[in-house]
Each structure stands twice: as C-alpha cells, then as structure tokens.
C-alpha cells in the first residue's frame, strides 16, 4: 500500500540584515526627512563630479543611490547605481543593491542578473546569496522552474559552506529543493549533511526516511523515523509514515497503532484515516473500516484524496 506521503515542511526564516548606509535594507524602512538628506548627498555628488577622481565619483553615486533606496525611490536608486557601475564595474555591492531595487520593482530577471554579477565579483558575498535565495523561493513557490530550482539548491549549498553555524537548516532546505527536482541521490546527501551538522534535526530525519521508503529501504526508513519520534513524540506525520513502513513490512497491528497515534495527535488527518481503514479492511475488521470511512466523509477532502476514499468505499462495500 503505497500512498503519497504528505509533508510538513518547515522552512527556515531568511533574515537579511544589511548595513544601514553601505547597503540598503531588504525591507524598506520609513523615509527620513528626504529633502535635507538628499540635498547633502547631491552636494557630495557635485563635489565629486567637479574632481578628476572617477572612483570617488562612483562612490558618491553609490552612496546617493543608497539614500534613494532608503527613501523607497527605487528608480532614482537604480539610476545612481548605473552611474556608479559605469565608472567602476567592480563594485559588487552596487550590483547587489541594484538587484534589490529591481526585485522590489518586480523586475525579477534584472534582479537575478545583478545578484549573479555581485556573486561573480565576490564569491563569498553572503548577502547576495541570501537575497537571491529569498527571490528564488518566491519565484518557485507556485511555478516550479527547473533552472531556478537548481540555482536555489546550489545557493543553499553555498550558504551552508559560507555560514558553517547554519549548515543544518541550509542543507535541509537544499534537500527539499532537490526532492522537488527528483534528484534523490543529491537530496539524500543534503539531508545526511544536515543531520551530521545537527543530529537532532527532526525534519531532516523525516525527509530522509521518506527517501529511504521511496527506494524500498524500509529498515533505514524505520530507523530514521524511530529517532525522529524519540526527539519529537508529537509528530503526527512521522507516526503516519512509520505506519506505512510497518504495513509494508507485514506488521499490520503495529501499522494500525501508528495510524491511530497520528490520529490522536491530528484527528482530521485524512491520509491516516484512509490508511487505517484500508488496513482494518485487510484484517477483516469491516466495522472499524466503516467507522474510519464515516469520519472521512465528514472532512473536506482534498480532490487528490477523493479517488482513494471511493476505492476504499467499494472495497468495504459501504453504502
């Protein structure tokens, strides 16, 4: 009995902390007395334009661009970053900040190009990776694009290397993206790395168990779920997954117990109801199977689960 295993994906919170002047905040803050501030930077630009130092002039444009950004005038910010980069194309932070401005204007292709150039110029530029990840997560949330998903997985890997203290959550997220790409081998390696970095990472243990289950390595899957449940004994999805594995191992009594525990923790868990009802039916306990089917009928069922319910109904000859 192979059911699609529902996931409870815990996504890491990407907190982008940028310096107030040298780099704008991702989330624009309230504008500050715009006229007085911008006038001061206009004067700095005018002074730089009167001189012969092109790098000083580029820096003046860059600094004024950051002020425009803080005032949420992203068009003017981009114009100043353009001027700065025309004079000094090695300014990785100007590319990064222009990418932020483009992203806020929903010009996503331009934003991705600028993030890529910032990273090309400075391969250890953490903020550029973090903000590109933020944008790629948004772009791939509802419309999967294989190229963007692969870039996202690669970026999580880069962040795991650049920020060793955060390796576990970044490798976990990388694994989830690789699962979406159906790259099970690479996903397994990412979850392995997450668990090495944090052996008590329950979500990584759960996801790795699903991969073991998918390739038929039931003992390894069971071991990961046992560990996950010792660490988090109220994880309904882990009980459900372990029930599937025990059923596949020919242990229906233990499977029913696990499905029951999942339902104690989450009474409206439709997959667990379907699995337990089917197992009851296999054991000849039609009364219990019909009771679970009745509970299913009281739920607003996802359309993807409705065929399984109707197959179950026919199987137990329920009206």
Q: Which functions belong to the PLM regions below?
A:
Residues 282, 287-319:
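Terminal, low-structured helical/coil segments at or just beyond the last alpha-helical repeat
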